[in-house]
Curated annotation (Swiss-Prot):
<dbReference type="InterPro" id="IPR050353">
    <property type="entry name" value="PyrK_electron_transfer"/>
</dbReference>
<dbReference type="InterPro" id="IPR017927">
    <property type="entry name" value="FAD-bd_FR_type"/>
</dbReference>
<keyword id="KW-0479">Metal-binding</keyword>
<dbReference type="GO" id="GO:0051537">
    <property type="term" value="F:2 iron, 2 sulfur cluster binding"/>
</dbReference>
<dbReference type="GO" id="GO:0016491">
    <property type="term" value="F:oxidoreductase activity"/>
</dbReference>
<dbReference type="InterPro" id="IPR012165">
    <property type="entry name" value="Cyt_c3_hydrogenase_gsu"/>
</dbReference>
<feature type="domain" description="FAD-binding FR-type">
    <location>
        <begin position="2"/>
        <end position="100"/>
    </location>
</feature>
<dbReference type="Pfam" id="PF00970">
    <property type="entry name" value="FAD_binding_6"/>
</dbReference>
<dbReference type="Pfam" id="PF10418">
    <property type="entry name" value="DHODB_Fe-S_bind"/>
</dbReference>
<keyword id="KW-0408">Iron</keyword>
<keyword id="KW-0285">Flavoprotein</keyword>
<keyword id="KW-0813">Transport</keyword>
<dbReference type="Pfam" id="PF00175">
    <property type="entry name" value="NAD_binding_1"/>
</dbReference>
<protein>
    <recommendedName>
        <fullName>Dihydroorotate dehydrogenase B (NAD(+)), electron transfer subunit homolog</fullName>
    </recommendedName>
</protein>
<keyword id="KW-0249">Electron transport</keyword>
<feature type="binding site">
    <location>
        <position position="240"/>
    </location>
    <ligand>
        <name>[2Fe-2S] cluster</name>
    </ligand>
</feature>
<dbReference type="InterPro" id="IPR008333">
    <property type="entry name" value="Cbr1-like_FAD-bd_dom"/>
</dbReference>
Amino acid sequence: MGGTALNEIVKKVKIAEDVFDFWIHSPSVSKEARPGQFVVIRLHEKGERIPLTVADTKPEEGLFRMVVKVVGKTTHELSLKKEGDTILDVVGPLGNPSEIENYGNVLLVGGGVGIATLYPIAKALKEAGNNITTVLGARTKDYLIMVDEFKEISDVLLVTDDGSAGMKGVVTDAMDKLFRERKFDICWAVGPTIMMKFCTLKAREFGVPIWVSLNPIMVDGTGMCGACRVTVSGQIKFACVDGPEFRGEEVDWDELLKRLAQYREQEKISYERFLKTAGESE
């Protein structure tokens, strides 16, 4: 990779509607990143900083992977980048790694693009000798990602809202079914915040401890700005330095959901302005 620039996009593939799979050249991130960690990127001098999970690494090639869903201005800008383009800043790896050990029977639950966050965790848990069962959920089969990769390392149960792949329903329906069929020692859930809240309630119903990966608003990624604060066991924590993973049963979900909605109108305005400007420049 001698001729590859730092933070260069080496590979980019569209893997679902509005979901893109990137491999980025960063020897330090690829070497140091552990399952559960993330990077903060900035596309250009006037760009905002956004956190994105490290979905996989190839240390021997100096590459790390990001799977990104277009949800706003910056992720849309990133989706327009081409192979050979570079990202101005990539800071990381940040956050605490997942607590990987041999638990026994482990249930992993991924929703939407959260599936990508689960992948390195699943690989590490498999290498630690765990028996893994994975529930992958999406609105329709067209939004399910990385299914074959998970099938290589775990038993997989698919769930879609419309029944176009696997079970018809939501991921907690699959959790209920699996918890009744066998004993699980621990669970991970990664996906939309509302999904993780209900996964936590379902795990608690069956007495199974659960880890969740939180995605609050984040700016600097070092605990300075305080934007990512969450209440865990009645104490203020920063997702960027204390997390991003926390025990689900300890999270104040209603407060987190309220905070996530705080800037939704501003985010919408910013995105609409960007789309208008982008359209005029074409």
